[in-house]
A protein has these predicted regions:
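Catalytic phosphate/metal-binding cores of nucleic-acid and nucleotide-processing enzymes, i.e., regions
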Residues: 1, 11-14, 33, 66-72, ...
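Conserved PLP-anchoring active-site segment centered on the Schiff-base-forming lysine
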Residues: 12-16, 28-47, 62
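Short acidic, S/G/P-rich loop/turn micro-motifs used as interaction or catalytic elements
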Residues: 24, 44-46, 78-85, 109-112, ...
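Active-site phosphate-binding strand-loop segment of PLP-dependent enzymes
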Residues: 57-111
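Short, charged, surface-exposed secondary-structure boundary motifs
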Residues: 47-50, 68-69, 137-142
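Conserved N-terminal alpha-helix of the aminotransferase class I/II PLP-enzyme fold
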Residues: 1-23, 27
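A short alpha/beta connector and helix-capping loop motif
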Residues: 115-130
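Conserved core segment of the aminotransferase class I/II
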Residues: 127-177
């Protein structure tokens, strides 16, 4: 976006169309279902629901107990509870770098936020996801994108490689931007 400085975004070269950000979340949770999920208090309710349903006794709030190897972090930015950069964003990412904890950044609202600078170059950030439904009135078209630093095969890749995706929504998204 114009006026935005997101250092490191160009490192995310593997792009997949997704049915909104939610499909990206689900694929991430499937990949990391054996890990302990870590969220900030006030995180988007979908992540809290997945913590309860999918991770059960493998979940802790960030800040209640230290991050550890074997954890996985999902964090919205802008943060779901405040609309700003999450508290301790850079220090959480630095700790995730140190411990090799994979991070998914939910950036669904970045296009309408006042956040102009972010450091996305942290190696722990494996996936960034966003959608067009916050900027344009297309919430029922499920126009999302998953951006990954490294290629990893999964069903979303298979859908995209074989063009087994909602082409109407993809074309609408291209037209909107």
């Amino acid at each position: 976006s114009k006026g935005k400085n997101f250092k490191g975004y160009q490192e995310f070269k593997h792009l997949d169309f997704s049915n909104g950000t939610t499909e990206t979340f689900d694929k991430f949770y499937q990949t990391h279902h054996g890990h302990r999920l870590r969220l900030l208090k006030g995180e988007y309710f979908y992540h809290q629901l997945q913590a309860k349903l999918m991770f059960k006794n493998r979940f802790d709030w960030i800040g209640d107990v230290p991050l550890a190897e074997g954890d996985v972090v999902v964090m919205s930015c802008p943060f779901s509870d405040t609309g700003g950069v999450p508290v301790d964003f850079d220090s959480i990412l630095a700790e995730c770098d140190r411990l090799s904890v994979p991070v998914l950044l939910d950036m669904a609202y970045i296009s309408i936020s006042s956040i102009n600078e972010l450091d996305l170059s942290h190696p722990c950030i494996k996936i960034i996801t966003s959608s067009l439904s916050k900027v344009f009135p297309v919430e029922h078209h499920r126009i999302g994108i998953r951006m990954r630093r490294e290629f990893e095969d999964d069903t979303l890749v298979a859908y995209n490689q074989t063009k087994y995706i909602n082409r109407y929504s993809v074309n609408l998204g291209h037209h909107m931007i």
